[in-house]
């Protein structure tokens, strides 16, 4: 789920940035620190949208920088368990597919695609069901449910697991076929 989150921090504005406006300097420093970061509290920080630094800062002896409290807004993506998401298949492997959801990729394991037996062809970039002949290939749009979320700290990649083994989940074409049958 995408959200605008309100955060606060203390930023160190070095002497070479004091020629810029306080707001611009603080915003640039926050972008360098937070954008592309993963936090267990807010999820994937995509971008900093607004910063409001305190005009009163602190000086530390021996350091030419000023320290300012700042409140800011960030656009974040926080994957929630059981959430239904839509994404695009970006990679096919011998154990499943990676699906782009927001700023990251989620793993769709072979056992979580469908109840049918599956054959994965990595060279062709396709997964084919044996009985129904349904296929999942790079570029396919899918609808899935998030079943596992593990967000690390810092810039490390989090891990997200998804499933399509429920009614009205899977490739968009599969869902359209199920709706016609219902």
Q: How would you describe each model-predicted region?
A:
Residues 1-182:
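Single-stranded RNA-binding regions, centering on S1/OB-family and related RNA-binding modules
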């Amino acid at each position: 789920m995408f959200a605008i989150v309100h955060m606060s921090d203390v930023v160190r504005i070095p002497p070479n940035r004091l020629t810029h406006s306080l707001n611009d300097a603080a915003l640039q420093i926050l972008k360098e620190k937070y954008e592309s970061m993963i936090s267990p509290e807010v999820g994937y920080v995509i971008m900093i949208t607004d910063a409001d630094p305190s005009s009163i800062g602190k000086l530390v002896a021996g350091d030419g920088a000023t320290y300012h409290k700042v409140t800011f807004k960030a656009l974040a993506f926080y994957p929630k368990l059981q959430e239904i998401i839509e994404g695009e298949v970006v990679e096919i492997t011998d154990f499943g597919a990676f699906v782009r959801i927001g700023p990251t990729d989620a793993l769709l394991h072979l056992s979580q695609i469908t109840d049918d037996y599956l054959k994965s062809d990595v060279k062709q970039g396709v997964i084919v069901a044996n009985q129904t002949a349904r296929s999942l290939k790079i570029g396919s749009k899918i609808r899935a449910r998030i079943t596992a979320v593990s967000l690390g700290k810092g810039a490390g990649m989090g891990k997200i697991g998804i499933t399509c083994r429920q009614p009205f989940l899977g490739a968009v074409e599969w869902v359209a076929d199920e709706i016609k049958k219902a």
